[in-house]
Amino acid sequence: MPRPMKWRKVCCLPESNRFGPLDLNAGDQYQVKMTVDEYETIRLIDLEGFTQEECAKKMNVARTTVQGIYIEARKKLAESLVNGKVLQIEGGEYRLCDGLGNGCGQGCYKRRRRMGCSGKEEGED
């Protein structure tokens, strides 16, 4: 029997989920898809300055898992920048942290409001 899925904890969704060249009407061959959990590792490690160990604790996964996610995220980011492809952030194996009782205790709800992060899961209106 396979191990049950361990969801990766994400503080907030990106305000914009599509980045790329302004002069390109990109089809699928000109897109790079980054998952929300890959985006979260870039945010925590590169923007917030956390170590991979600290990032792993925040996302509720092993450090080796974060390392793999981070490597893939950086490859996708580089491919988008170097090859002029649109970066589309969507999907992944994640759950939004509510920042409340069962949350991380790091004030995710307050941070989402301050940063303007979306608190809606994909498909919600």
Swiss-Prot record:
Gene3D superfamilies: Winged helix-like DNA-binding domain superfamily/Winged helix DNA-binding domain. Disulfide bonds: none annotated. InterPro entries: RNA_pol_sigma_r3/r4-like, UPF0251, WH-like_DNA-bd_sf. Pfam families: DUF134. Belongs to the UPF0251 family. This is UPF0251 protein Dhaf_1981. It comes from Desulfitobacterium hafniense (strain DSM 10664 / DCB-2).
